[in-house]
Structures are given as C-alpha cells and as structure tokens.
Amino acid sequence: MARSSFKLEHPLERRQAEANRIREKYPDRIPVIVEKAERSDIPDIDKKKYLVPADLTVGQFVYVVRKRIKLSAEKAIFIFVKNTLPPTAALMSAIYEENKDEDGFLYMTYSGENTFGLFV
C-alpha cells in the first residue's frame, strides 16, 4: 500500500502528539484517518480526520463515509485497514486496538472496488 498522504504531510512527532492529545481529551473516541485508495474512481472525501465513537461499528462508519462522499445507494464502497476488509460488525475500538499506527491514528482506505480482495 502506498504511504498515506497524511503521513507525508505531517511528521511522525506531530502526528503522535496530536493523537495523544485527542485520546487524553476524548478517551471514548478513536482518531481515524480516511483516505481514498489510489486509482479508485470513487469521489474524494472532503475531510480525512475523524473522531469516531469507540462503540461505533465498522458498518456504521462506512455509512458515515458514504454520506461524506455523497455516494449513491447502488454504488459499492469498500473500507480497508492494512489492505484487509474488516468485519462490518466489528467495533471501531477493536479495529483500532488491533491496527492502530505507531503514531496513534487508525488509517483506513476506501475504494469503489474490492481492490485487495482479502476478507478477515
């Protein structure tokens, strides 16, 4: 997977400090970075950083992303964490604990195609 543009734009120390500050201020929230997969023809998202309730499911978060990119109901969207499709019923807190980056953010990629083809 290509390196996140968020990671390229912000040095590690700044990302770590921001994630730590967020987690201290909002312990029941998950700091998430959402970016479009390369070569995907799906619309761009208007913002990359989200503060997600820990008890939100992946499926509920996919709904939030769909709304942000104004994707019509008949179009498919896939959300990946480390090139893998997480279970839609999984809690964001569980996905975060298993997959958070060294900087403290959870990185998710979305695409209109199942580009990686891996199910957990």
UniProtKB/Swiss-Prot annotation:
Name the InterPro entries on file.
Atg8-like, Ubiquitin-like_domsf
Q: What is this protein called?
A: Autophagy-related protein 8C
Give any Gene Ontology cellular component. Answer: autophagosome membrane
- Look up the record and give one Gene Ontology term from the biological process aspect: cellular response to nitrogen starvation
The site feature described as Cleavage is recorded at 117-118
PTM (free text): The C-terminal 3 residues are removed by ATG4 to expose Gly-117 at the C-terminus. The C-terminal Gly is then amidated with phosphatidylethanolamine by an activating system similar to that for ubiquitin.
Propeptide found at 118-120
**Taxonomic source organism:** Oryza sativa subsp. japonica (Rice)
Q: Which positions anchor the lipid (Phosphatidylethanolamine amidated glycine)?
A: 117
Region listing for Disordered, in residue ranges: 1-20
> What the protein does?
Ubiquitin-like modifier involved in autophagosomes formation. May mediate the delivery of the autophagosomes to the vacuole via the microtubule cytoskeleton.
* Pfam families per UniProt: ATG8 (PF02991)
Against CDD domains, the record matches this protein to:
Ubl_ATG8 (cd16128)
**Assembly and interaction partners:** Interacts with ATG4.
Which keywords label this protein?
A: Autophagy, Cytoplasm, Cytoplasmic vesicle, Cytoskeleton, Lipoprotein, Membrane, Microtubule, Protein transport, Transport, Ubl conjugation pathway, Vacuole
**What are the subcellular locations of this protein?**
Cytoplasmic vesicle, Autophagosome membrane; Vacuole membrane; Cytoplasm, Cytoskeleton
By sequence similarity, the record places it as follows: Belongs to the ATG8 family.
Question: How is the protein disposed in the membrane?
Answer: Lipid-anchor
One GO molecular-function annotation for this sequence?
A: phosphatidylethanolamine binding
